[in-house]
Amino acid sequence: MTTVGTSSVPCLASDPSRGHSGDVLAIVAPGQGAQKPGFLSDWMSDATFSDHLAWLSAVADIDLVTHGTTSDEATIKDTAVAQPLLVAAALATAWSVDPEIFSQADLLAGHSVGEIAAGAAAGAFSTEAAMVLVRERGRAMAEAASRTATSMTAVIGGDADEVLTAIKAAGLT
């Protein structure tokens, strides 16, 4: 999760009538692709972080400690691993920075799978529910992608007519 300092951009969260000074604490959880081999290694020396990551691993029934510290790139790119790993990393790093950080945040958001971490942080559902949800979501998406090469496809940019022609040529809808 990325903590984005303060902002002077006018928004509802910085409205003085709502008790805000004008500074806004926004926490944004990343989506799949933010993970790198060993990206959690340095965090493991922090007891708050390592305890939370171990607990989240147990809840998800996935060894997220190993995946965040020693698993190779191919392993952590697997959607079934990457998604629970990213949600757990977002929650554990934020709690390590400040155990009360989510209650202090003015804005919580997430990109793609990061929305699950943001939802748990906002109290929309429990942390345990978030970890079970993201585990099942990751497994389902990995299974769908393994059945058909184009079952999990995204188009980023390009000329609209060319993109539509390519989609049609591939037999996709």
Model-derived features: positions:
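Actinobacteria-biased recognition of intrinsically disordered, low-complexity terminal regions
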Residues: 1-21
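Residues within well-formed alpha-helices
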Residues: 55, 89-92, 116, 129, ...
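Alpha/beta catalytic cores of group-transfer enzymes, especially the acyltransferase/condensing modules
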Residues: 32-34, 60-62, 72, 121-173
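Helix-rich "cap/lid" substructures immediately adjacent to catalytic or cofactor-binding pockets
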Residues: 14-109, 171-172
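Gly/Ala-rich beta-loop-alpha elbow adjacent to hydrolase catalytic centers
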Residues: 90, 106-114, 118, 126
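Alpha-helix C-terminal capping segments
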Residues: 96, 100, 119-125
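Basic, gly/Ser/Thr/Pro-rich low-complexity segments located predominantly at protein N termini
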Residues: 36-38, 66, 115, 119, ...
